Amino acid sequence: MDIISIVLLVLLVVLVVAFIFYAQNIKKNKQDAESLFNEAENKANEVMASAKREAESLKREAEAFKKEARYTLREEEQKQRREIEDEFKQERQELKETEKRLKQREEILDRKDDTLTKKEENLDSKEENLVRKTDTLSKREEQLAHIEEKKRLELERISNLSMDDAREIILSETRDGLTKEMAQTIRQSEEKAQAEADKRAKNIISLAIQRVSSDSVAEQTVSVVNLPDDGMKGRIIGREGRNIRTFEALTGIDVIIDDTPEAVVLSGFDPIRREIARMTLEQLVQDGRIHPARIEELVEKNRKALDHKMREYGEQAAFEVGAHNLHPDLMKIMGRLHFRTSYGQNVLDHSVEVAHIAGNLAGEMGENEALAKRSGFLHDIGKALDHEVEGSHVEIGTELARKYKENPIVINTIASHHGDTEPLSNIAVLVAAADALSAARPGARRESIENYIKRLKDLEAISTSFDGVETAFALQAGREIRVMVKPDKLTDDQIVILARDVKNRIEDEMDYPGNIKVTVIRETRAIDYAK
């Protein structure tokens, strides 16, 4: 074999090997392409599936958002509808109240129109009477002139009197006759005017009173506190009676525990003390912690709470009578009258009633109705402080009105409503009349309880008049007086002498049935705080 053949053979082998390698390479590339295609197809399927899931999720979220938006829109629509309905109801209620006020105003105007019509009719009647009387007098004058002429001629003929003498005689006789007739006419007119004035006054008072609706409730000197069970009575009494003794000493109120089921009675003449005791006992029963320290804490807390409540009572009463721009201190002082009685009549209710009656009287008389109501409302304000400040309630009330710069008419009304000072205005007279009407109406007052309360107050006043006495409480319906002294002012030996002195003063200055027990208490406390 020659070289060419060998070369050709080698070339052939190379070609065959290259072809085989090329074929394998093509096959491998095809497999790689198929693998890449399958992988791309799988990824595309995954992307499509993910996109489909995302689309379904977005669709569900859109549906949920749509439902939520529809629900929110429905809620908002219902809320707006309710607000509109409430606003409509409120406006309709306001419209009804306005119509009611207009109707009341119209009724007042109708009554005033009727009154004016009656006055006009009375004036017309009086005018007609005057015209008739004038005509009668004219005729009488003509008759007298004719008679006078006849007399003159007769006298001249008979007595040969001169003209001047005859004229004097005739005038004298005529004057006497006219004087008698005039006196009779004046007397009849005065009697008629007096009858008309009495009738008019009764009519005005009737109109003023019938427009005031008042309660006839007598004040009591006891309060009842309900208990959850009878076992609570023992806890109120405490070990060896220490709880009930502390309670009575701090409040000055008798605690009556008897066989009445599930109830305790608080007895005391001072309504403020009794209210503090009632509030304290109810809170103790509700809380369940009943011991001297807790009792002392609640008594002090309720004293402050009652001060706030008294201001609310004063503001409510002032709003009811229309007494605007009252000084806040005056409102608080007026609120104290809610817990003050006069012959069993609540003084704050009495003041409101006097304000309404005085306002109605002023309206009928053409006076300032608002000023009359304000004067009537404040006329007894001194009674709120008459047991704390020296002087009568009239003097105290006058000084308070001056202090807070009230209208001079209001000041004079307070000073004159019991006749101590001359009234300087019609309003002062009207308030005095309204005060008498309110006190005199049936069921308004009860004198026996007032005398009883005065005796208890006198007991306390005598006891607190001695040096070193801190406070005193009349208990057991006035059969016992407990005197609390300052331990740094009096010794144990001195309180024995004080008890005897109080007893002697009571015997000398008071009239009372039975015996009165005088108890003087001296208590020393040492307080410190562990830190």
Curated annotation (Swiss-Prot):
Record-annotated KH domain positions: 221-281
Annotated TM spans: 3-23
InterPro entries according to UniProt: HD/PDEase_dom, HD_domain, HDIG_dom, KH_dom, KH_dom_type_1, KH_dom_type_1_sf, Ribonuclease_Y, RNase_Y_N
Membrane topology: Single-pass membrane protein
Uppermost EC category: hydrolase
GO molecular function: RNA binding; RNA endonuclease activity
One Gene Ontology cellular component annotation held by this UniProt entry: plasma membrane
UniProt entry keywords in alphabetical sequence: Cell membrane, Endonuclease, Hydrolase, Membrane, Nuclease, RNA-binding, Transmembrane, Transmembrane helix
Localization of this protein: Cell membrane
EC assignment: 3.1.-.-
Domain HD residue range list: 347-440
Coiled-coil region(s): none
GO process annotations (BP): mRNA catabolic process
Record family assignment: Belongs to the RNase Y family.
Summary of the function given for this chain in its UniProt record: Endoribonuclease that initiates mRNA decay.
Protein name listed in UniProt: Ribonuclease Y
